[in-house]
Amino acid sequence: MSLDTAEKQKLIENHQVHPTDTGSVEVQVAMLSKRISKLSDHLQGNIHDFASRQGLLKMIGKRKRLLSYLKDKNVQKYQELVKKIGIRG
């Protein structure tokens, strides 16, 4: 499940570190989280879509690695991002 341009732009604006930022860890995690939630909704109704399930697991793994990296580099930003996105507790 991909995001349309307007959704991507809104996520980038909400999570960017500076005006031209499109690839920081915060932006990447926000985009992955949105894609994960859309794909999870899709899988609720399409239980036997195993290809999408595999893609979901890959996205979850990538988000986990990015969050781990951010936590190692800057715990304060990590905590703010987790709270803002609403994941992990």
Swiss-Prot record:
Function description: One of the primary rRNA binding proteins, it binds directly to 16S rRNA where it helps nucleate assembly of the platform of the 30S subunit by binding and bridging several RNA helices of the 16S rRNA. Forms an intersubunit bridge (bridge B4) with the 23S rRNA of the 50S subunit in the ribosome.
Subunit structure: Part of the 30S ribosomal subunit. Forms a bridge to the 50S subunit in the 70S ribosome, contacting the 23S rRNA.
The name this protein goes by in its record: Small ribosomal subunit protein uS15
InterPro entries: Ribosomal_uS15, Ribosomal_uS15_bac-type, uS15_NS1_RNA-bd_sf
Family that this chain belongs to: Belongs to the universal ribosomal protein uS15 family.
Designated gene of the protein: rpsO
Organism of this sequence: Prochlorococcus marinus (strain AS9601)
UniProt keyword annotations, A-Z: Ribonucleoprotein, Ribosomal protein, RNA-binding, rRNA-binding
Gene Ontology terms: biological process: translation
